[in-house]
Amino acid sequence: MKKASVVGTTCILTYVVNYYLRHILSVLTPALLLTGNFTIEHIANLSSTYMLLYAVGQLVNGFLGDIFSPKYMISFGLLVSGAAIVLFPFIPWKLLQIVCFAFLGFGLSMLRGPLMKTISENTSPNHARLICVFFSFASFCGPLLASLFALINGWNFAFIAAGSVAVALSFVSYIILSVMERKGLISYMKTKVTGIASVLAVFKIENIFFYLVVACIVEISAASISQWLTTFLTVSLGFSKETANMIYSGISVIRSFMPFVSLAVFRAIKERDIPMMRVTFSIAAIMFALLIVSSDKWMSILFLSIALMAMSCTSALLWSIYIPSLGKTGRVSSVNGVIDCIGYIAAAGANLLFANVMSNVGWNTVYILWSLIGVIGLVTTFVFNQRKVQR
């Protein structure tokens, strides 16, 4: 239990910083737009560059994470991403700003796979599942901290503070993981198969294709929709950027408890994940669709919050239930990398689509697209179940 506590605490703290960095652009978008130096299109380019490099990096670093010691990848990833964010406020050139977010994406892609590998291969299945629930909780604490920093301080300070903490944590995490390795508290399974065979082996793992589709849906929700949340609050609903950040913080707090709700419901319904996903996808589709007819901004916030809560429950089933169950395969980092890569490629494409639609068509069409994401998820669960029956 002591080992699980140390492993869990180290990984969770690292993941909070990870998600602070991942969502900092989203919460600071209204402030950046007010400067007059940033446009929606340029911010979309920044976020999509980050997403694409994160996706590619997840694929590459996911497999490397099953070969090399996670402590090197975790510490180096924090160092690179932190340095990129510290430099960003001081760079006036758009192309170099995009380069900063490219380094941010690739640096952060070095974290999740090795972190999941550390948890899954060094704790019992029950402990791993519980730690990963807190892992998901941490993924919402990061955006919450980012929004609070944005509310209290200027956008420049928020970037510098986030990057500085990441750089400092890169050294702290390396020291902690090194000490635990020397004491024999943690060890890692190294894959013996490399190259194309290693890639193909991932696709032989049970249910991988179904969860690849789920990953696309939850990452579009977590990354693409969340990216434009504060913009939705300021531009579509007319809130000030300060109020928008407060609302964003409130939504993040509520969503942070969804992993615990998911685990409790999952156990209560005897670990039947597919029926649970059908409910969450249905709720999300309906709530997003209600935004089209809503004329009250507070009701719109309620509908959006419920939709995002439902998607967060689905996300928890993927990251807190399915991934930790693969510890004995020795390919946790690889599977995580493939799933996150595909998910973020989908999110990057959706991000550009949403930006184009909201600029040239209107928000109602954006709501329709968001609702369709839930519909696609619902249909996928029935297709997957039908194939299981046929087999």
Role assignments for model-derived ranges:
Residues 25-27, 206-259:
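Extracytoplasmic gate region of multi-pass secondary transporters
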Residues 56-95:
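Conserved MFS/SLC helix-loop-helix module at the cytosolic interface between two early adjacent transmembrane helices
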Residues 58-69, 259-271, 358:
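Helix-to-loop junctions at the C-terminal end of transmembrane segments
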Residues 100-137:
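Cytoplasmic helix-loop-helix junction between adjacent transmembrane helices
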Residues 134-181:
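Helix-loop-helix hairpin linking two adjacent transmembrane segments in secondary transporters
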Residues 181-211:
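Juxtamembrane intracellular "pre-TM" segments in multi-pass secondary transporters
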Residues 272-318:
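C-terminal transmembrane helical hairpin of 12-TM major facilitator-type secondary transporters
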Residues 326-361:
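A late C-terminal transmembrane helix in Major Facilitator Superfamily
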